[in-house]
Amino acid sequence: MMATALTLRSMNRSDRDLYLFDTFEGMTRPQDVDIHASGQAAMTEFVEEQRGEDSSAVCYASLDEVKSAMARTGYDPARVHFIRGKVEETIPSQAPESIALLRLDTDWYESTRHELEHLYPRLSPGGILIIDDYGDWQGARKATDEFLANHAPGLFLSRIDDTGRLAVKP
């Protein structure tokens, strides 16, 4: 999201609200379907790095750390919204009605499925969808493929790199 804020600033645009949905406690508990491209079950890493019953030190950044990083971009802080909690609990109730850029980076099947189900319909025509973990985690890929087959057949996912995929909503 820092790159988005910096890009908007470089374009002299400060009229966009930025929403950051995160637990700010590390990764949530994965399911059996969440397997890395290497074949390792996500639960193995989760247990090794477990911080609490439902969180792991993997990808941990506190809310204060993220706020501080976003502040360094110089983007209008009144336009940056930090939504704390599991996406399954905060979306759709705290999501904006209209989305121009939707970047999903929650890794797991259940969270990716939930995000797509509730946020893709809010993505504006011509809006950009980025699935960060499509090439890394089987769960994220499965959730994406299932959703697109049922709700957006024919949507072309362009490969960004080994992990990311990008699409433009028709």
Predicted features and spans:
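S-adenosylmethionine/decaboxylated-SAM
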Residues: M1-P170
